[in-house]
């Protein structure tokens, strides 16, 4: 098949059972990540980006000559910049200055403009109205694509779904779909221990880029979340550093957080023999200048 647009390449990412990792940690549950780095612009955010732009076009909100202005913690902007380029739109993104240099460079590589906001303000400092944290097209993308892919690829044998929460589109959309298919599926939201707002704690600075926006997103649907799992900075970094040596797969810091959570969940006796599907949002190459690879 010859595809006619890069938009057609979004989704359809594979599941991979981490057999080496499971042996290394003595796990009796199956840890099965979905490798979202294989999307065309390199992350899970390609899904929401495509859906948001297509929904905006359908609603007549954007058309030829339009300018897309969005706040982003990085991957969303990269996905939007890619889709915007393919659809012929100009794109401008606001993002905290603390985000990795690689992310800024990638945005510019797609022809987007970048406006940096003070890092101390976190994502709140980059928020404008009508953004991804509130946009219903964000969870819809996962309800329509990621969830059905997981269900089909596991033949419906998914017992637990684990995902980090940034905008919350991934956990909300997948949670809704999977629980419609089987209400017994457990959905686990992962957040930074240093900024545990989903579990009622106080917002604070943390090192896990891509999750933990320091506020509860409008798209977050607590009714589909069975557990909120808090991950310390060092645990996320340690998992992200260890996985490539065990499995030959590079992941980012938020993927490390999700992997740490999934690993701890797999150690629980009640989860023996269960399939734990976890989202790996992107590739570790996006974080070469960060604490993840600091000497």
Write out the residue ranges for each language-model feature.
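PLP-dependent amino-acid enzyme catalytic core
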Residues: 1-295
């Amino acid at each position: 098949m010859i595809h006619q647009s890069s938009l057609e390449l979004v989704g359809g990412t594979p599941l991979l059972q981490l057999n080496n990792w499971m042996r290394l940690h003595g796990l009796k549950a199956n840890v099965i990540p979905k490798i979202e780095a294989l999307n065309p612009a390199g992350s899970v955010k390609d899904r929401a980006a495509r859906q948001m732009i297509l929904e905006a076009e359908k609603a007549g909100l954007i058309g030829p000559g339009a300018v897309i202005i969005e706040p982003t913690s990085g991957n969303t902007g990269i996905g939007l910049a890619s889709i915007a380029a393919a659809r012929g739109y100009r794109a401008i993104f606001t993002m905290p200055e603390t985000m990795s240099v690689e992310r800024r460079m990638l945005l510019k590589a797609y022809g987007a403009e970048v406006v940096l906001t003070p890092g101390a303000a976190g994502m709140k400092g980059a928020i404008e109205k009508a953004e991804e944290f509130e946009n219903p097209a964000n969870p819809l993308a996962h309800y329509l694509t990621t969830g059905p892919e997981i269900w089909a690829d596991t033949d419906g044998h998914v017992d637990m779904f684990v995902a980090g929460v940034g905008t919350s589109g991934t956990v909300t959309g997948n949670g809704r779909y999977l629980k419609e298919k089987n209400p017994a599926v457990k959905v686990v939201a992962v957040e930074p221990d240093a900024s545990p707002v989903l579990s009622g704690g106080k917002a604070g600075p943390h090192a896990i880029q891509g999750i933990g926006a320091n506020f509860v997103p409008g798209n977050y649907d607590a009714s589909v979340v069975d557990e909120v799992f808090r991950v310390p900075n060092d645990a996320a970094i340690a998992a992200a550093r260890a996985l490539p040596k065990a499995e030959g797969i590079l992941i980012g810091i938020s993927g490390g957080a999700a992997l740490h959570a999934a690993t701890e969940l797999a150690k629980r006796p009640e989860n023996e023999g269960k399939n734990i599907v976890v989202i790996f949002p992107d590739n570790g190459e996006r974080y070469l200048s960060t604490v993840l690879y600091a000497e």
